[in-house]
Amino acid sequence: MDQYNLNTREGRWKHFGSVDPIKGTKPTEKEKMTDLQSSKKDFLFEIDHVGIKNLTYPVRLDGYQTAGTFSLSTHLAKDEKGINMSRILESVEAHYDNGLSLDFDTLKTVLITLQTVMHQKDATVDVDAKWFFDRFSPVTNLRAIGHADTRFSMTVEGDTTVNKSLTLTAMVTTLCPCSKEISEYSAHNQRGIVTVKADFAPEGELPANFKERILEAMEVNASSMLYPILKRTDEKSVTERAYENPRFVEDLLRLIAADLVELDFVTGFTIECRNEESIHQHDAFARLSYNK
């Protein structure tokens, strides 16, 4: 058995099974390596989307730095074998500035870069990120940080945006109208999870507060909003407001839809409301889609 100097890192590595590299026969210089992805012949089908998913990358959203989860893809013509996937992250890195600014203008710039370096006709991105914002308690007006989940989605062809949407997911309180109606006192209530996918005119301008206006439609139509901090006077207000505004999932869905119809920058939407029922082991849900 070979003896190694265990006082050195290399010796310890070999003691634990590491071996010296072999002398290979394949080229080590990039220019001499075979580029399989760039092979050209009939590969039978073009591909709508090919790229990477679950890329975690720092983003900046409304003054907060958070982690974004990216899916980035391009089209692939049928006479091309594959894409150079390293160029995807290079396209993101080219726009890094203490994180990537999470807004549609920046995402469009990233996609145009990606599309150009890939020599493809379109590019698509989806970014999931936590959105943090100030939330004030209803009576004492104490500030704390609230949050919602966002997904920014966009596709470009050339210099033109062909679709653009925002998905927001937020939690609310819902109090059961049936429980209130049939009970001598009290009513069961629970958290509701509301998800809105709002579509926008691809090349249209959005107001600076477009996220806030969509979130407001989701929250104010519930029995109550959720708050990070509640003192006793706040808790009394929240409890009584919920009792005064009972909502089935069907009610909440329709009320949110009515508000979204009135937002002129929203061209269509899909809403889902899901209640984590406090008196059942299952959830209740409702969903609708609408195009203006």
Swiss-Prot record:
InterPro entries: GTP_cyclohydrolase_FolE2 (IPR022838), GTP_cyclohydrolase_FolE2/MptA (IPR003801)
Site, May be catalytically important: residue positions: 176
Residues spanning the membrane: none
Pfam families according to UniProt: GCHY-1 (PF02649)
Organism superkingdom: Bacteria
Assigned EC number: 3.5.4.16
Gene Ontology biological-process annotations: tetrahydrofolate biosynthetic process
Keywords for this protein: Hydrolase
Pathway: Cofactor biosynthesis; 7,8-dihydroneopterin triphosphate biosynthesis; 7,8-dihydroneopterin triphosphate from GTP: step 1/1
Enzyme class: hydrolase
GO molecular function: GTP cyclohydrolase I activity
Protein family: Belongs to the GTP cyclohydrolase IV family.
Function as written in the Swiss-Prot or TrEMBL entry: Converts GTP to 7,8-dihydroneopterin triphosphate.
HAMAP family in the record: GTP_cyclohydrol_B
Protein name (record): GTP cyclohydrolase FolE2
Species of provenance: Macrococcus caseolyticus (strain JCSC5402) (Macrococcoides caseolyticum)
Lineage: Bacteria, Bacillati, Bacillota, Bacilli, Bacillales
